[in-house]
Amino acid sequence: MNEKKPKPRRLAYGVDPKRPQRYSLRQARYDALAHDIDALAAEAARQGRRLSVLDIGAGGGASPLHLRARPNFAAIDLDGADRDRQYNVDESLYRRFFIADLTEGCPELASESYDVVICEQVLEHIHELRKPMETIGRLVKPGGKAFVGVPIFLPPLHLARRHLVPRLDRLVRSTRRRDHVQAFTLASVKAALLAYSKLSFVEARGFRIISGGILRPLEERRAWWAFNRWLGARIPAACIEVQIVLEKPAASQKA
């Protein structure tokens, strides 16, 4: 009698165990940044150098899973950082892993030491944004880039999330823990990043206007992913999540 072989584990984009859908819209942000960083690594390799990348607020380590599947990962020196080890991230995914608190400015990390800084799904958990955003800008080398991703609301829904939801929680005596302490719009997070990081705006791209539920089966189809990427590039402010790409002017531009 033949035993049934277990089905292989389904991974988002072939690499990410967080979601089983092949083209998961929730994980699309990591696929997008991996695509761009891989292109930067290819350019660095052509110039005979390596690309230094920092994944700050690394969480469960989604970024390296997507990056290491790319053809130019061998040209990347990838470091990770988080305030503690609560997520039990596989530190072997990184060249080095730092215990460093973004809210304290990450003094362990040298200024202008990374070609790329990734800060995905971190800032919405932080009350005071000035120092974390200043730190992102401080760590990027001249000519380097930052990829900053947060959930956002379409105005005026951010006001409901900020003011009405806490009142309703108190009214119904909800015990639900809400980890998000910020209610960003695209305009508000972009303005704060430009003011505090001192980096220049490159682009904003949105992910997921509507997803999950009865639409989740569509996330097995590349065409649905492509449509959402197209839509998110054109109306990022209407999306549930946004990724803002920033750049530090090269030293020659500052002169």
Residue spans for each PLM region:
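Conserved N-terminal segment of class I S-adenosyl-L-methionine
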Residues: M1-E112, V116, M133, G206-F207, ...
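S-adenosyl-L-methionine-dependent methyltransferase catalytic module, highlighting the catalytic core
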Residues: P8-Y23, Q27, H127-G137, K145-A250
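A short beta-strand submotif of the Rossmann-like class I SAM-dependent methyltransferase core
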Residues: V116-V122
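Short linear motifs at secondary-structure transitions and domain/linker junctions
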Residues: A28, L51-G57, R70-I76, E91-Y94, ...
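Conserved short hydrophobic patches within well-ordered secondary structure
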Residues: L93-R95, Q121, A183, I210-S211
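Residue-level signal for short amphipathic helical patches enriched in basic/charged
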Residues: G48, E124, F184
